[in-house]
């Protein structure tokens, strides 16, 4: 069955009105959704209400949006890291978990400009104990030296074969490097060169541990020089 309509559109007071000719719907009077068919003054008329969306966000909503924007951008830059650091948390993605846990670590000024507190940022989160790692930097050689202290096993919270990682983040360039260190049950020193184009003054350093199978992690800790 085919319906043939001849529409002529008119707009009055946020309503769209269309005059139509249909042999099958002559003198129709019916409503379907936001469309009303009627017969008036010898003509078939279809009326549709136009709904407009009013968006008057409060200061709190604007601040929330600013935080979300900066954290979503950061999560993209750190994606290979947070995929290891946020596992088995809730039903969402690692990026969603990262964003949710770090909302309180972002401040917003009166112009709705968001600033991340990198000294409190979590690039990993979980039930494992954080590893014990210290770092130094050689300006002459442009090398980071990560010194790792062996930890005893704690059933359910720390295992000798847990994998320890360091993460370097260049805050101006927005680039990250993930460095595998040693197993939790080992002492040792691991060196890593400052990447080209990076400025040491802009680098933030973090460490965390994961289960050997990658299905669990510790909270990350910021490392200071």
Whereabouts are the PLM-identified features?
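Charged linear interaction tracts used for macromolecular binding and regulation
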Residues: 89-225
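Long, polar/Ser/Thr-enriched low-complexity segments
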Residues: 2-4, 8-130
